[in-house]
Every structure is written in structure tokens, then in C-alpha cells.
A protein has these predicted regions:
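Amphipathic alpha-helical segments in well-structured domains
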Residues: 28, 32, 253-256
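A short-motif feature that recognizes glycine-rich, charge-decorated loops
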Residues: 17-31
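Phosphate/diphosphate-binding loops
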Residues: 30-55
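Structured secondary-structure scaffolds
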Residues: 1-6, 12, 47-290
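Long, charged N-terminal interaction/targeting segments
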Residues: 3-6, 15, 34, 39
Length: 290
């Protein structure tokens, strides 16, 4: 937002635990009060008011997400736009709306953030010198050989100096501690499974228009300028009777065995065979009584 408005921004104010730096004040509780009191202290406070609004929450813990300014690694997707559009136009879809949806999603993406701050996953195996990437060709080859011989965990198991060849030791190089976005990982599955061949079909749910379908196309166009698949088949999802995603935490999972006992198995089979697989299906009494 600051970049869009050409505003200067300084050092990140939050630590990795969501507290104001140098304090134990959590940003959503004591931290807010601290900032308000400081504003009042300098006569900069205007108004305190409670309002109800929508705010992003973590889907697992159901707690608010805090935003933090961090350095990341990005792919500039504008450089791939022409190649992606060209290849996408050659792909066959089981429904035209899915072509339009995927094309629109990819057209609206400008950057792909490749780095993650997680304790698990594939390492983003680059070295840094004074905060900037330092990876000459011979060092790239050295790292690739290490991973080929020892597996990707070698990056986590050894310190920076032990990973470096003699030529680059004692130069102040440090390994990057980030991991790679899992969609980049899964999106390159075409390389290990088919290498230069195209898959006849990729089949997944509609959520993969922003996931695997997209990341597979991007990585394949990056690597050898062609789509990894000839056809995309997209299916809908089985939802609860209210049209909500089934979830153990929500307690709204419909057990097919319960349906079978209540209506018999043939009714369950016939009901599911009667729906259009490209659309979402509400699983409830209404479906089986029809």
C-alpha cells in the first residue's frame, strides 16, 4: 500500500510473534492500547470507536492474521504473460467457463511470491552476502550436486560454512533459511513424472484454478515454453445441505454410510449419478428425496 501511494516506510514494527518490537505487547491487544496511549501523549489521537468489519483469520486456528513487512523472493509474471496466454489457448477444457476463469485469474496476477518462512518444506537453496543473493554458476552447480547426493535436507542439516566449497568459505556468505512455496514444488511434478512429454489430462477440483493447474502451467512455460497438459477437466465439490464446505471442525460432514442406511445404497448411487459433475452438489435430504 505504501508503494502504491509513494509513501516512505521504515523498519518493520512487529516481531515474528506479532508483538511490537522490543516489547511483549501483542499487536491486537496490549499493543493497540500502547499505540493509542502514545498518540494521546503527543496530542495526535483523534477518535476511539468500535465497529464491526470483516478481517482475515487463519483457517486452522480461527485467530486474526497480522501483517508483517518482510523481504521475499518473487517471480515477475508479466514476463510470462504472452507465453502463458499462448499456451492456455491450446488447452482443451471440459467447460468454457473454466477457461475464462483460469485466464482471468492468471491475467490478474503480477507477482508470484516463492518464499515462505516455515520450518518444513523444500529449502530455498541460495546463499546471501550482506542480505543480497550471491549465487555464481559454479556455486549453483555445487549446491545442486549436494542435493542430488544427499537429498534436500542437507540444506537444513549443515551450517553455511559446511555447505560451501573451499573457494567460497570465510566470505561472510550465509544460507537462506526460507522454504519454497509448496505450489512451486507440486507445480513442477510434470518434470519428474513426464519430463518433456505432455500429460493427456489434468483432473482436479475447481479450487485448483488458483493452485495446481496454475502453478503447473507457469513452471512449465518458464522451463520450456509449453503447457504441461493437453486438457484440463474440472469438477465441482460435494457440499453440505446449506452449500457450505464440509469440515470436521464445523461438524457438518455427511457420511455416505449414514445416507445409505437411511435411503439405501441404490438411492445414494442414483442421486450422485444424476448430478452434473462440473457443478457443486448440496448433499442433503433434498437431493435424495428428489
Amino acid at each position: 500500500l505504501c508503494k502504491q501511494l509513494n509513501l516512505e516506510y521504515g523498519e518493520e514494527l512487529l516481531d515474528n510473534d506479532g508483538c511490537l518490537k522490543g516489547t511483549n505487547l501483542y499487536c491486537f491487544t496490549e499493543g493497540n492500547l500502547y499505540v493509542m496511549n502514545k498518540l494521546k501523549e503527543f496530542n495526535l489521537f483523534v477518535k476511539d470507536e468500535k465497529l464491526e468489519h470483516s478481517y482475515p483469520h487463519d483457517w486452522r486456528t480461527k485467530t486474526p492474521v497480522f501483517y508483517k513487512l518482510t523481504k521475499q523472493f518473487f517471480v515477475d509474471l508479466n514476463l510470462l504473460k504472452d507465453g502463458v496466454n499462448n499456451q492456455l489457448s491450446k488447452v482443451e477444457f471440459n467447460h468454457s467457463r473454466y477457461y475464462n476463469r483460469l485466464k482471468s485469474m492468471m491475467g490478474n496476477r503480477k507477482l508470484w511470491c516463492l518464499s515462505r518462512q516455515r520450518s518444513w518444506g523444500l529449502p530455498l537453496a541460495v546463499f546471501l552476502k550482506e542480505g543480497e543473493v550471491f549465487m555464481p554458476k559454479d556455486l549453483q552447480n555445487h549446491v545442486m550436486n549436494l542435493v542430488e547426493e544427499n537429498g534436500s535436507n542437507v540444506w537444513f542439516n549443515k551450517n553455511s560454512e559446511d555447505l560451501l566449497p573451499e573457494k567460497y568459505k570465510n566470505m561472510g556468505l550465509v544460507k537462506c533459511e526460507y522454504t519454497v512455496d509448496v505450489w512451486f514444488d507440486s507445480g513442477t511434478s510434470w518434470h519428474s513424472v513426464l519430463n518433456d512429454k505432455q500429460a493427456d489430462v489434468y483432473l482436479e477440483g475447481s479450487d485448483q484454478h488458483r493452485g495446481w493447474f496454475q502453478s503447473s502451467l507457469l513452471t512449465s512455460v518458464m522451463y520450456h515454453s509449453k503447457a504441461p497438459y493437453k486438457k484440463l477437466v474440472t469438477h465441482g465439490f460435494v457440499l453440505d445441505s446449506n452449500g457450505q464446505k464440509m469440515s470436521k471442525s464445523l461438524g457438518n460432514v455427511v457420511d455416505p454410510l449414514d445416507v445409505s442406511k437411511k435411503y439405501n445404497t441404490d438411492v445414494l448411487r442414483l442421486s450422485l449419478l444424476s448430478v452434473d459433475y462440473v457443478n457443486d452438489v448440496k448433499m442433503g435430504d433434498g437431493l435424495f428425496k428428489t
